[in-house]
Design a protein with these regions (language model features):
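Catalytic palm subdomain of template-directed nucleic-acid polymerases
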Residues: 143, 178-189, 306-307, 397-412
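A glycine-rich phosphate-binding loop feature that marks nucleotide/adenosyl-phosphate handling sites
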Residues: 86-89, 169-173, 199, 207, ...
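Polymerase palm active-site segment centered on the conserved acidic dipeptide of motif C
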Residues: 189-192, 403-440
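Short, charged, amphipathic alpha-helical segments
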Residues: 167-170, 189
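Helical catalytic core of nucleic-acid polymerases
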Residues: 87-163, 173-183, 220, 226-355
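Acidic, glycine-rich two-metal-ion catalytic cores of nucleic acid-processing enzymes
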Residues: 2-4, 16-18, 24-60, 189-288, ...
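Short glycine-rich phosphate-binding loop at a beta-alpha junction
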Residues: 74-88, 250, 308-309, 391, ...
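Conserved DEDDh/DEDDy metal-dependent 3′-5′ exonuclease domain
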Residues: 2-13, 17-159, 253
Length: 440
C-alpha cells in the first residue's frame, strides 16, 4: 500500500500508463491555503484495483519522494480529486477534475468534509498550533480517507460520460479561479485575522460547485464575497505596488441587461432605472424618490414575479413569456441547460422548484458563465502586465494596478468587459473601503 523506494515508484509510473487513474493529493496543512501549502502524500488508484499511497513529506518516511513530485505534476489525462488545487501545486492542466464531474453528475456540491476520518479530526484538535499537521497524521489514516473518496468517486469516474459541456467547464473554471486566487490580496496590519496573512497577503478561495453555479468565496471563516462597505472590513485591503491603486469595475444593472440579452430586447446604454421609471410613472423626469422606487419595482418584478398590470410594458411582457417557456420546458423534459456552458439542471435534484426560482437559478448561471468568459479574456490581456485581477464578486471585478500601467490596461479591460453592450462603472482608491468614481 505504502510506496517505500524509488524502484517501486518507477514501477507504479510504468503501470499507470494507458490506464484510468484517480489521484488524490493530500496537503500538508489543512489550515493553509493551497497557494502556500505543500503536498504531504499522494494517493493513486488504477482501474484494475491497484492502489498506493506515496509519501512526499511525512514523518513516517523522513526521506520521502519530494524530489519526484514533478513526475506526478506532469501526468496527463488522469482524474484529480481537486484540479484547482492541483494547478496551484504546479500540476498539469490536461487532467479531469473529480469535483466538477461530481457536480455535473449529481447536481450537488462535493462535500469534502465528509471524507475526513476521526483520526484527522483528533490530530487537528489536539495539535491546533502545529504546522503541516497532515505530515504527522498516520499514512494509514490518509489511506483510509482516500479509500472513502475512491468508494464514491470511482463508480462515477468509470460510468459518467465526459460531455462537451463538462470538458469545456473543466478546461476553464479550475484554471481561471486558480489564477485569481494565486494573485492574493495585499492587506495592512489592521486585518484582523492574522493567521490568514502570509507575506502581507491573504488568499481568497472560490467554490464554484454551488446550486446555481454562482461562486461563493470564503476561506477559514473570512467571506471575501460579502465584505461590508460600512463596517470597516474593507479597510485593510490595499495595493501591493509602491505607486499603485485598487480599481473596481462594476457592471451597471447587470442582471437586467443579461435578461434583455436573453429575450433579444434593446435597452439604452443610459440608466435602465430611468428608462423603466418613465414607463412606470408616465413622465420624462423622475424625482430621486421615483428613481429609487423604479429600481425597487424592477427588481421585485424580475425576482418575485411579474404582476399583470406590468405585462403591457414590452420588456416585461417578453420576460414573462420567456419565463413561462423555460418553465414549460423544465416540466416537459425534466431538465434545462444553462445558456453558455450548457450544464444540465435536472428536475430530480430540485423537487421543490418553482417557476420564479427556476428563472433566478438560470439567471445566476448566465451571470456567472458570461462573467467567466469575460474574465478569461481579461486574464489573457493581463499576461503582458503587472496588473492583477484579485477579486471577482458577482457583478464586479477588483484589480490591483501599478500607476505606470493604469491608463493603458484599464481602458483595455473596460472595453473587454463592456463588449459594446454592458456599461461598466469604475472606481479607484488606495484602500478598498474608500473608492471614488472615475471616468475612463
Amino acid at each position: 500500500m505504502i510506496v517505500d523506494d524509488k524502484e517501486e515508484l518507477d514501477v507504479i509510473f510504468d503501470y499507470m500508463k494507458d490506464k484510468t487513474v484517480l489521484l488524490v493529493p493530500i496537503l500538508s496543512d489543512h489550515k493553509l491555503h493551497p497557494i502556500i501549502n505543500n503536498i504531504s502524500c499522494i494517493y493513486i488508484y488504477t482501474e484494475d484495483g491497484v492502489e498506493r499511497i506515496i509519501p512526499m513529506q511525512h514523518t513516517e518516511q523522513i526521506r520521502g519522494f519530494k524530489d519526484q513530485l514533478a513526475r506526478f505534476l506532469n501526468l496527463e489525462s488522469i482524474f484529480v480529486h481537486d484540479k484547482k488545487v492541483w494547478l496551484q501545486m504546479g500540476g498539469n492542466d490536461a487532467v479531469y477534475d473529480v469535483k466538477s464531474l461530481w457536480w455535473y453528475t449529481y447536481n450537488e456540491a462535493y462535500d469534502e468534509n465528509y471524507y475526513y476520518t476521526s483520526a484527522h479530526h483528533f490530530y487537528w484538535r489536539r495539535h491546533t498550533n502545529l504546522n503541516h499537521i497532515n505530515a504527522v497524521v498516520p499514512l494509514m489514516q490518509h489511506l483510509e480517507m482516500c479509500q472513502k473518496i475512491r468508494k464514491y468517486a470511482w463508480p462515477m469516474i468509470i460510468n459518467s460520460k465526459l460531455t462537451t459541456s463538462y470538458n469545456q467547464f473543466n478546461s476553464i473554471y479550475p484554471k481561471l479561479f486558480a489564477e485569481i486566487e494565486s494573485n492574493g490580496m495585499q492587506v495592512t496590519r489592521s486585518f484582523k485575522m492574522n493567521d490568514l496573512i502570509t507575506d502581507g497577503r491573504v488568499y481568497s478561495q472560490y467554490h464554484y460547485h454551488t446550486t446555481t453555479g454562482r461562486p461563493s468565496n470564503a476561506f477559514r471563516g473570512f467571506n471575501f464575497a460579502a465584505m461590508n462597505k460600512e463596517d470597516g472590513t474593507r479597510d485593510a485591503f490595499c495595493s501591493r505596488f509602491e505607486n499603485g491603486a485598487l480599481i473596481e469595475m462594476d457592471f451597471d444593472a447587470y442582471h437586467i441587461r443579461l435578461i434583455a440579452r436573453l429575450i433579444g430586447y434593446d435597452l439604452p446604454t443610459t440608466s435602465v432605472h430611468q428608462y423603466f421609471g418613465k414607463q412606470y410613472f408616465g413622465k420624462e423626469e423622475l424625482t430621486d424618490e421615483e428613481y429609487e422606487k423604479s429600481k425597487q419595482i424592477t427588481f421585485r418584478l424580475l425576482y418575485g414575479g411579474i404582476d399583470k398590470e406590468f405585462l403591457g410594458i414590452p420588456f416585461f411582457g417578453e420576460v414573462n413569456k420567456y419565463i413561462s417557456e423555460l418553465w414549460a420546458e423544465w416540466k416537459k423534459q425534466g431538465v434545462i441547460y444553462t445558456p453558455v456552458e450548457r450544464r444540465p439542471i435536472n428536475s430530480s435534484t430540485f423537487p421543490d422548484m418553482t417557476k420564479n426560482k427556476l428563472f433566478n437559478y438560470y439567471l445566476q448561471a448566465l451571470e456567472t458563465e458570461f462573467s467567466v468568459r469575460r474574465m478569461m479574456q481579461v486574464q489573457n490581456t493581463l499576461k503582458d502586465y503587472k496588473t492583477k485581477l484579485i477579486l471577482y464578486t458577482y457583478d464586479s471585478l477588483l484589480f490591483d494596478v501599478p500607476v505606470t500601467e493604469a491608463k493603458e490596461v484599464l481602458i483595455k479591460v473596460k472595453n473587454i468587459l463592456q463588449g459594446g453592450e454592458f456599461p461598466v462603472k469604475c472606481k479607484v482608491g488606495n484602500i478598498y473601503s474608500k473608492m471614488n468614481n472615475i471616468s475612463l
